[in-house]
A protein has these predicted regions:
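Internal, well-folded beta-alpha domain core
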Residues: 61-62, 73-186
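N-terminal, charge-rich interaction modules
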Residues: 1-63, 67-70, 81, 174-175, ...
Length: 186
């Protein structure tokens, strides 16, 4: 492991992890809203938002899958040192990190009827986040919200699987938004 892996974590772990957790949970509770998130300084190509999200949610009991662009020694070492999370295949992952075109959504766990919570959460690195584009409705949204999603049909199909399905966290720079499986997309 190189010394760069030791850097870039939370400098004030209790405060930063609590603030980051709140940002991620707010994003999940209010689909379509974009929140600022910071704390981590991960190696490229991980954004501040994705790195901070991983430091907040991943631990030694949660398998993380890295897509091709992120599956680099520096990233693996950094993630392992700061979270202890095992690096796993897509079929075993609780969390996955990647660009949209690299995430094979068919490969990840959708949960079961007995345990719908045993599904994967995909952390999708986006070029930008904006409250425009797809229309979102459902829990946590007063009337409707908007978010630039990479592909509307897939999110509609994912919603049809509810209570099974994938959850999505979108990151760009130091900003985060989310799309839980319960959200209707049009």
């Amino acid at each position: 492991m190189n010394s760069a892996a030791l850097e870039g974590g939370f400098t004030a772990p209790p405060q930063q992890s609590a603030q980051a957790f709140r940002s991620v949970m707010q994003a999940m509770a209010r689909p379509g809203r974009i929140y600022d998130i910071e704390g981590a300084v991960p190696p490229a190509p991980i954004s501040i938002a994705a790195g901070t999200t991983l430091l907040t949610l991943a631990d030694p009991t949660t398998g993380v899958h890295l897509t091709e662009s992120f599956d680099k020694k520096e990233v693996r070492d950094w993630l392992t040192f700061h979270t202890g999370a095992p690096l796993v295949s897509a079929t075993e992952a609780e969390f996955a990190l990647g660009y949209w075109d690299e995430l094979d959504t068919q490969a990840y766990q959708l949960g079961t009827a007995e345990y719908p919570d045993r599904s994967a959460t995909l952390i999708v690195e986006m070029p930008e986040l904006s409250q425009a584009g797809a229309t979102l409705r459902g829990p946590g949204i007063e009337t409707e919200a908007h978010l630039n999603l990479p592909e509307i049909a897939l999110f509609k199909a994912n919603r049809a699987l509810f209570p099974l399905g994938l959850d999505f966290i979108f990151t760009s720079g130091a900003r985060v938004a989310a799309l839980p499986r319960s959200t209707q997309v049009s």
